[in-house]
Amino acid sequence: MELTFLGTSAGVPTRTRNMTSIILNLQQPTRAEMWLFDCGEGTQHQFLHTPYHPGKLNKIFITHLHGDHLFGLPGLLCSRSMQGNSLPLTLYGPKGLKEFVETALRLSGSWTDYPLTIIEVGPGLVFDEEGYRVTAYPLSHPVECYGYRIEQHDKPGTLDAAQLIADGVPPGPLFHQLKRGQRVTLEDGRVIDGSRYLGPATPGKTLAIFGDTAPCPQALEMARGADVMVHETTLEQAMAEKANSRGHSSSQQTAALAKEAGVGTLIATHFSSRYDAEGCLKMLAECREIFANTLLAEDFMVYKMA
């Protein structure tokens, strides 16, 4: 699991920070997948500065319908079509996403030449398939807003092939079934339980990507035990009251959540345009006073989940 931050600004862009968008590059059991979280204005332009291409996207998750998280979506969808891409794309987001996309395409005389599916989510399970479970959590913001918790399925333990051969199981297609912990029947009638030949499973990674939010109980539930938490840090601690009144979080409120939830790493992002590089570093220092393992997201920063 690898994150690439395409935009880390809140509200409006700055000279060094674009609007919110994050690529999640996944290595699936049978194929690679690429997901996008939010699509602020200029996202497709940010792609040009990365090794990735919008045509390779499989899924796009929108946290809420505020423009700084959404206004880059129609252009990206149309460009993807103009480039002759036929890979199906699924959009996930709150109620109103389908109407927004269909209206933008209709009024601009645009269309997509690839299968486009739009799924409006509610609180709870979004899907559990192909190695990953995604759950949407409602957050505290002036409009309907969600965070997404991505849980990687545990990886099966190593198959003890040497022991299987020693027990008279011939190498071949049966090993694939045994690797999944299944039972197989040999030609001689013996039943072999694959789980007995597997080493310990490797726990999957958990990633929590938040939309905009003021502190709320659901945030703790969403973040609990995550290996990585990506969370907005819109304003410095001295402006916490102002941040909360607008459905946002301050630096130390975000850090306190990371600490209470027991996350491994906090990546702070979504900084107000009032802050230059020095101002963002000040907020990073405020976060680290409470939660030491905090990173400051920057446009085009890449973070690999080990």
Swiss-Prot record:
Key words of the record: Endonuclease, Exonuclease, Hydrolase, Metal-binding, Nuclease, tRNA processing, Zinc
Top-level EC class: hydrolase
CDD domains xref list: RNaseZ_ZiPD-like_MBL-fold
GO MF terms, alphabetically ordered: 3'-tRNA processing endoribonuclease activity; exonuclease activity; zinc ion binding
Binding site residues for Zn(2+) 1: H64, H66, H141, D212
Entry-linked InterPro entries: Metallo-B-lactamas, RibonucZ/Hydroxyglut_hydro, RNase_Z/BN
The keyword Zinc appears for this protein: yes
EC numbers on record: 3.1.-.-
Subunit structure of this chain's protein: Homodimer.
HAMAP family per the UniProt record, alphabetical: RNase_Z_BN
Protein name from the UniProt record: Ribonuclease BN
Organism of origin: Klebsiella pneumoniae (strain 342)
